[in-house]
Regions:
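A conserved catalytic-core segment of Leloir-type glycosyltransferases
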Residues: 39-106
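Conserved catalytic-core segment of nucleotide-activated headgroup transferases in glycan assembly
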Residues: 203-283, 287, 292
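Acceptor-binding helix/loop patch of EC 2.4 sugar-transfer enzymes
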Residues: 71-95, 135-168, 204, 209
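A charged, aromatic-enriched C-terminal amphipathic alpha-helix characteristic of glycosyltransferases
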Residues: 366-397
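A short, active-site helix/loop in glycosyltransferases that binds the activated sugar's phosphate group
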Residues: 127-129, 168-197
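Short hydrophobic beta-strand element within catalytic cores of glycosyltransferases
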Residues: 317-320, 327-331
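Membrane-proximal helix-turn-helix segments that form the acceptor-binding/catalytic region
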Residues: 28, 105-110, 145, 157-180
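Acidic donor-binding loop of glycosyltransferase active sites
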Residues: 175, 296-313, 326
Length: 404
């Protein structure tokens, strides 16, 4: 057993975004191999900065499961800078500069001294100068951050070239990089001047055990949503990430334009997660707003919907749908980073033909689609199960694989 420290810019458990699902899933997989995994998050979420938490000290400790814990630093310097940057729509450039300059919490330095291996969750958390810099230090890539900044607001776009330089230097900065898709692997490989990196693929897989629901949960959630057995329910889950917001806008427009079609065919779409700041219902559209857990909505649903049309890397929600044994209805772009084949493994759609695709979906019964979803999972689970993905990845990394 070895001590692994994962440095994160924000508290990741419980996961509230696709990125946090990826981070905590990798951490869990490492812990279940037998390592002692310590996530150190340099800032908390808004609700963490309550007087009661601050009175207990500037680090909030939580045990996630045996062998896995998270420490969340609640110091006001990091907290205020995070709040201001978010309010002004700035990326976490400030965080990168602070960590790269060695301006970090004392507790993090202590954790680094005790660590055998260090992992940076995203390039915004670079290696920290100090005696621990000689330890194996890995980057967990979620996507190409500079691509996301290019697609972001005008203010975010100004930092795209800076982030491209940071990511371009990553092959010379880290021991190796855990990539998430072919896109980021190709980028890092093109900047690996010495061709020394393995760049193992850890797709945005999930823990399938979390997506095995109790028999009564489906009926319980559908009753809560006011649905009966004859109603069809599609789920779209997402955070406030810009491509999700745009997809949500398309879903809203579709539900309004096709209100008669949706009502006639008893089809509903539930949008689960913080992609919307408020909960409401408008005809066939059910919006949950921020919720503690989106998984019960997967249990209630008949298919997973993904209308995302831009971004980078791969889409965690696709892997969640597969693990929940949901048939997938998605844009072709939405399945990037997977090996799914259109109309063999999922129903490909666009905003223009979604009506026809829904008709095709409801034209077969649920028994057919459940069997289809099980078959798709069986054929693709090795690329979806985070435990398998992490096991394979570390097996090819000599300094890290030797710790198994």
């Amino acid at each position: 057993m070895k001590k692994i420290v994962i440095i994160s810019g924000n508290r990741i458990a419980p996961a509230a975004t696709g990125g946090q699902v990826r981070s905590i899933s990798i951490a869990r997989a490492l812990a279940r191999i037998g390592h002692s995994v310590h996530i150190f998050s340099t800032a908390g979420r808004r609700e963490d900065y309550r007087p009661a938490n601050l009175r207990r000290g500037i680090t909030m400790e939580s045990t996630i499961e045996p062998g896995l814990k998270e420490s969340t630093h609640l110091g006001l310097t990091f907290g205020v800078m995070q709040a201001v940057a978010r309010r002004l729509d700035y990326p976490r450039v400030w965080q990168h500069h602070m960590l790269a300059s060695g301006i970090v919490p004392t507790r993090l330095k202590q954790a680094l001294r005790e660590a055998d291996v260090v992992m940076s969750d995203l390039p915004y958390c670079p290696p920290i100068p100090g005696p621990w810099r000689e330890k194996p230090w890995y980057l967990i890539s979620h996507n190409l951050e500079h691509k996301l900044l290019e697609q972001g607001s005008a203010r975010q776009g100004r930092f795209a070239d800076w982030m491209r330089a940071v990511e371009g230097a990553a092959p010379q900065t880290y021991t190796d990089i855990l990539v998430c898709a072919e896109e980021d692997r190709a980028f890092f490989r093109s900047h690996d001047i010495q061709s020394r990196m393995m760049l193992p693929m850890v797709r945005c897989g999930v823990d399938p055990r979390l997506y095995s629901f109790s028999p009564g949960l489906r009926q319980q959630m559908r009753a809560k949503l006011g649905l009966v057995d004859e109603d069809w329910l599609l789920v779209f889950s997402g955070s406030g990430f810009a491509p999700n917001v745009e997809a949500f806008r398309d879903i809203k427009e579709f539900c309004r334009a096709e209100a008669e079609f949706m009502a006639r065919n008893r089809v509903y779409i539930v949008v689960a997660g913080s992609v919307s700041s408020e909960a409401y219902r408008d005809g066939a559209l059910i919006v949950t707003g921020p919720v503690p857990d989106v998984l019960p909505y997967f249990a209630a649903s008949d298919a997973g919907l993904n209308m995302v049309t831009r971004g980078s890397g791969s889409n965690v929600k696709l892997f969640e749908y597969l693990a929940a044994r949901l048939p997938v209805i998605s844009t072709v772009f939405g399945v990037r980073g997977t090996e799914l084949m259109a109309f063999e493994d999922y129903l490909a759609c666009s905003r223009n033909d979604l009506t026809e695709i829904i008709l095709r979906f409801i034209g077969s019964n649920r028994v057919f689609w459940r069997a289809k979803a099980e078959d798709v999972w069986d054929r693709h689970k090795h690329n979806c199960d985070i435990q398998d993905l992490v096991n394979d990845a570390i097996s090819v990394l000599p300094p890290f694989g030797s710790l198994r």
